[in-house]
């Protein structure tokens, strides 16, 4: 598949304008409780996002169109899920690149872009439609594990909490803020390590970084990881890194 090819999927046509989702705080709170009791229950993340995100996806798409290469990215409409499931493509990335780090991460953690997408389809059926906003929502979903690499946050409980705070700063999606706040409140009484400060730093790092949703990820994955972080103004996760892995 070339850089400009798009993924062919049986997405339902969007024959009517997508409605702005109504925020459902009760649904979000129940899902947050389930997520905090089991961080591996990824489906609850999509429940929360669907309940709280409102029109943030539409706003993100419109913002993309105002960026230097956003018009091209929107026109090409590459489906990152399929690109990230191409094992031969992932194997082509040289050591030290963002792509190599992503490849090693998902394989060592037994993750896949398709696995994450399948969970989202179970919880958010409208993400399947053939509509620019839905495509942008899929794109945002599919870069989550790449953001793990760029941010330096691992998949432990604290790392996920820091990354959702980082993601809120990047996307403005209220669901991310809700999850980050829940995680921070849960760790507030644990004074041995700076958990809340690390989560807050995640937000500040996301705010200081360039807008990652405007990136051409097929190109970004070829960049050396350290150089990409410098270009994108992603500072070190100093507080997170200061906490022993066993305590995260």
Residue spans of the language-model regions?
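Sequence termini and other peripheral, non-core segments
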Residues: 1-82, 88, 225-248
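Core of folded catalytic or high-affinity ligand/protein-binding domains
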Residues: 43-223
């Amino acid at each position: 598949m070339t850089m400009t090819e798009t993924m062919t999927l049986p997405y339902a046509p969007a024959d009517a304008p997508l409605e702005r989702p109504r925020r459902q705080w009760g649904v979000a709170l129940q899902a947050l409780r389930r997520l905090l009791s089991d961080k591996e229950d990824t489906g609850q993340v999509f429940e929360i996002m669907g309940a709280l995100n409102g029109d943030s996806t539409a706003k993100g798409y419109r913002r993309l169109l105002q960026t230097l290469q956003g018009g091209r990215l929107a026109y090409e409409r590459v489906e990152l899920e399929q690109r990230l499931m191409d094992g031969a493509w992932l194997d082509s990335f040289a050591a030290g690149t963002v792509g190599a780090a992503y490849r090693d991460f998902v394989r060592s953690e037994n993750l896949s872009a398709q696995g994450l997408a399948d969970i989202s389809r179970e919880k958010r059926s409208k993400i399947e439609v053939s509509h620019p906003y839905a495509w942008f929502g899929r794109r945002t979903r599919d870069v989550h594990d790449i953001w793990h690499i760029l941010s330096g946050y691992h998949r432990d409980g604290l790392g996920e909490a820091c990354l959702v705070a980082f993601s809120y700063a990047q996307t403005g999606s209220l669901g991310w803020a809700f999850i980050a706040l829940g995680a921070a409140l849960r760790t507030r009484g644990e004074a041995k390590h700076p958990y809340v400060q690390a989560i807050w730093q995640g937000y500040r790092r996301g705010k200081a970084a360039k807008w990652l949703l405007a990136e051409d990820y097929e190109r970004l994955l070829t960049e050396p990881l350290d150089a990409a972080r410098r270009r994108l103004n992603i500072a070190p996760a100093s507080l997170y890194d200061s906490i022993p892995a066993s305590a995260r």
